[in-house]
A protein has these predicted regions:
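C-terminal motif of bacterial Sec signal peptides marking the signal peptidase cleavage site
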Residues: 17-20
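Bacterial signal peptide processing site
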Residues: 22-24
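Long, intrinsically disordered low-complexity tandem-repeat segments
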Residues: 29-92
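N-terminal carbohydrate-binding accessory modules
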Residues: 89-160
Length: 456
């Protein structure tokens, strides 16, 4: 009996010691997370200003394949800790897999005002060295993206980030996406969701959509399905904070010329877009995991409001009933983009007449009447000034377009690129070049109640 009692005491003592060690490890881990904030701040300048300061590496990318920064436990901590080191990235937990019981209309309402990570992963060109991801990422003027940049967007009040991706940039001849490219996109998605924003991932400047489909439809579908099959598989367990968008500004000039084409050609072009969108929904829904219920974004023909309302655009049949439509707003083009007169139009230097407001309201009312009021949510996936115009009028246009979209229950997603006409956000310095427009956006956003965002 004495021996048994003695052994029992020893076991209890050893258990107590082991419990203490585990507890100590947790405390040390927490301290490490807090201390990395200083490291993150010290490295930020190097990461944004030099190629060697990239926030990702081959080793890091392979380690992040099965990890995510968007779990409920890590969302609050990631704001104060760096994910720019290999140690931090490999310690990430599995992605949050929560799919809330909310409609797509409720989700779009909760998406608030969004912003694009433009001219970054959508950059493309034959002159770009395709040996490394960063060559595409920085080709059109963006620095290498860091989590500090994503965090700055979130802290400014943006609730959604659209991540345009040209998957064809790093795609094999048999349509396999390069692992490093996929890993990098996943890392960006993790940062976006980890900082409390919705992430929209699409096919952007994949020119085969406009070029291959009209000449070889079967091969076009094969390539399109191959890309979305891989993307769907990689992200199938992500929560409903990730949205897939079928395409970007798709159209078929080889089938139908918008200005000289026939009605029959027009119907053929729209039918093809409708069939591609249907195949997109069918493929994602059949891919397993949370994709069976994922909220999806359907691109209208050229994402044009007029085309979306001409009676030929058809929303896909979706067993989950979770689709929204995407259009863009760059109207009037002579004001938004033209800096010199052309044969087809004269550059405008002012905006804000009663006729201008009537045009804005008319186009947005089309989307509200024909979509929102009929239960189909609307996301204006892009809008911004594309030319340097007098600030007084340029600011007015951007503010009024944001307000008009928002007040109609739709989600405005601003097109932000580096060196843009309005110099909206500088990713290198993390500063806002147009605080007046930003403040107006924040004021507009505040008109919605997001206090119970998980249930609204």
């Amino acid at each position: 009996v004495r021996k048994i009692i003695g052994l029992t005491i020893i076991v209890l003592l050893l258990t107590s010691i082991m419990m203490g060690c585990k507890s100590g490890t947790k405390v040390d881990s927490t301290d490490t997370q807090v201390d990395t904030a200083a490291t993150q701040a010290a490295c930020a300048d190097t990461q944004t200003d030099t190629e060697d300061g990239s926030s990702y590496s081959t080793d890091t990318q392979s380690d992040t394949e099965d990890t995510s920064a968007n779990s409920a436990d890590t969302q609050t901590d990631t704001k104060d800790t760096s994910v720019n080191s290999a140690d931090t990235q490999t310690d990430k937990e599995e992605p949050d897999t929560d799919m809330r019981d909310i409609t797509t209309m409720q989700l779009v309402y909760d998406m608030g005002i969004g912003i694009n990570l433009g001219n970054t992963f959508d950059s493309t060109g034959d002159w770009i060295n395709s040996s490394e991801v960063r060559n595409f990422e920085t080709a059109w003027g963006s620095p290498v993206i860091t989590e500090n940049m994503i965090k700055a967007y979130a802290e400014a009040g943006f609730r959604t980030m659209r991540i345009p991706v040209t998957w064809s940039n790093m795609l094999s001849s048999d349509y396999v996406i390069d692992t490093a490219w996929m890993d990098r996109i996943q890392q960006i998605v993790d940062w976006v969701i980890g900082n409390g924003m919705y992430a929209i991932v699409n096919l952007h400047h994949d020119s085969f959509i406009g070029e291959l489909f009209p000449t070889n439809e079967a091969e076009g579908f094969k390539k399109y399905e191959a890309i979305w099959s891989q993307v769907s598989e990689r992200f199938k367990d992500y929560s409903d904070y990730l949205i897939f968008e079928s395409m970007n500004e798709p159209g078929f000039d080889a089938i139908w010329n918008q200005y000289t084409g026939t009605q029959k050609q027009k119907e053929r072009a729209f039918d093809l877009i409708n069939r591609i969108n249907q195949r997109f929904v069918d493929l994602v829904r059949a891919s397993g995991g949370n994709n069976a219920e994922r909220h999806l974004l359907i691109s209208a023909y050229y994402t044009n409001i007029g085309h979306a309302n001409n009676g030929l655009t058809k929303m896909p049949d979706d067993p989950a009933g979770r689709c929204a439509i995407s259009v863009h707003y760059y109207t009037p083009w002579t004001w938004v983009a033209l800096e010199h007169d052309e044969t087809w139009g004269k550059a405008r230097w002012e905006w804000g007449t009663p006729e201008d407001y009537a045009e804005l309201n008319s186009e947005l009312d089309l989307m509200k009447t024909n979509y929102v009021d009929k239960g189909i949510p609307v996301i204006i996936g892009e809008y911004c000034m594309c030319s340097k115009k007098p600030k007084e009028y340029s600011d007015l246009w951007e503010i009024e377009v944001t307000r008009g979209i928002y007040e109609r229950g739709m989600c405005p997603v601003y097109w932000d690129v580096q060196g843009s006409a309005t110099n909206f956000f500088d990713r290198k310095t993390l500063t806002w070049g147009n605080p007046e427009v930003l403040a107006a956006m924040q004021e507009i956003s505040a008109t919605r109640d997001f206090t119970n965002r998980d249930d609204n």
